[in-house]
Amino acid sequence: MRTRKEVLEYGLSLPDTYQDAPFHDPNWILVRVKKNKKAFLWTYERNGQLCINIKVDPEWRDFWRNAYEAVQPGYHQNKNHWNTVILDGTIPKHDIQRMIAESYDLVI
């Protein structure tokens, strides 16, 4: 996954989700769960790179950060519960999808 469109399409394919732009800034697009309005996927560009923030179980947080250099502590979020993933092509699509799905599972 290397485009915002791909990431958003995957996030929106999960049950009962919707897209939101709460900051009235087109750079920040979120995907939320309808029933509780909790965000599980944030998309934005930073330093010329497309990034996503995803909620992470603290037990898996360091696994993902150690597995991929492009997975870092969550930008502008709680570093214990969120990771930032730089979509630079170094992480296989199935792992990005897994991280997004796990984030979804944590907020439903």
Give the label of every model feature segment.
Residues 1-108:
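Charge-dense, helix-prone N-terminal extensions
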